[in-house]
Amino acid sequence: MAAAADSFSGGPAGVRLPRSPPLKVLAEQLRRDAEGGPGAWRLSRAAAGRGPLDLAAVWMQGRVVMADRGEARLRDPSGDFSVRGLERVPRGRPCLVPGKYVMVMGVVQACSPEPCLQAVKMTDLSDNPIHESMWELEVEDLHRNIP
């Protein structure tokens, strides 16, 4: 039963679900500060005089810019990022409309030239504009307070 809790079904391209909660990040943080590679990404915090954070999974929010064939390009306050595997994500399809504001939880696949996530969860947040207006401050506050 534990194996079922550790992987997201979807055939050979299944995603291994992390055991820790997702870390809220902006696209620019991944572009600028991520080190490592798939399955072993870390967010450098050397500029703040702190140790790195493991990026087992991330939580990002942004506006859908484009969506096609289970992939989407989103834009947060710091830039664009891509999400793939949306055809296997519950509630992914209703969210895939340009202009919608969504949250996506996923596993980092790449950080350069732009972040790319393998989606695990996606939810439409468009009904409440406070989600978008507070997102950047929420991420900033979280990173300021993580030891």
Swiss-Prot record:
Transmembrane segments: none annotated. Residues 44-114 bind DNA. GO terms for molecular function: DNA binding. Changing K24A: Abolishes interaction with RMI1, TOP3A and BLM. InterPro entries: NA-bd_OB-fold, RMI2. Changing K100A: Does not affect interaction with RMI1, TOP3A and BLM. It comes from the Eukaryota. GO terms for cellular component: cytosol; nuclear speck; nucleoplasm; nucleus; RecQ family helicase-topoisomerase III complex. The keyword Mitochondrion does not apply. GO terms for biological process: DNA repair; DNA replication; double-strand break repair via homologous recombination; maintenance of rDNA; negative regulation of double-strand break repair via homologous recombination; regulation of sister chromatid segregation; resolution of DNA recombination intermediates. Keywords: Acetylation, DNA replication, DNA-binding, Nucleus, Phosphoprotein. The modification N-acetylalanine is found at A2. Residues 1-20 are annotated as: Disordered. The modification Phosphoserine is found at S7. It is found in: Nucleus. Phosphorylated during mitosis. It is linked to A homozygous deletion of RMI2 has been found in a family with a Bloom-like syndrome and is probable responsible for the phenotype. Patients manifest depigmented skin lesions, multiple cafe-au-lait macules, and growth deficiency. Cells from affected individuals show a high rate of sister chromatid exchange and increased chromosomal breaks. PANTHER family: RECQ-MEDIATED GENOME INSTABILITY PROTEIN 2 (PTHR33962:SF1), RECQ-MEDIATED GENOME INSTABILITY PROTEIN 2 RMI2 (PTHR33962). Component of the RMI complex, containing at least TOP3A, RMI1 and RMI2. The RMI complex interacts with BLM. Essential component of the RMI complex, a complex that plays an important role in the processing of homologous recombination intermediates. It is required to regulate sister chromatid segregation and to limit DNA crossover. Essential for the stability, localization, and function of BLM, TOP3A, and complexes containing BLM. In the RMI complex, it is required to target BLM to chromatin and stress-induced nuclear foci and mitotic phosphorylation of BLM. Belongs to the RMI2 family. This is RecQ-mediated genome instability protein 2. It comes from Homo sapiens (Human). The gene is RMI2.
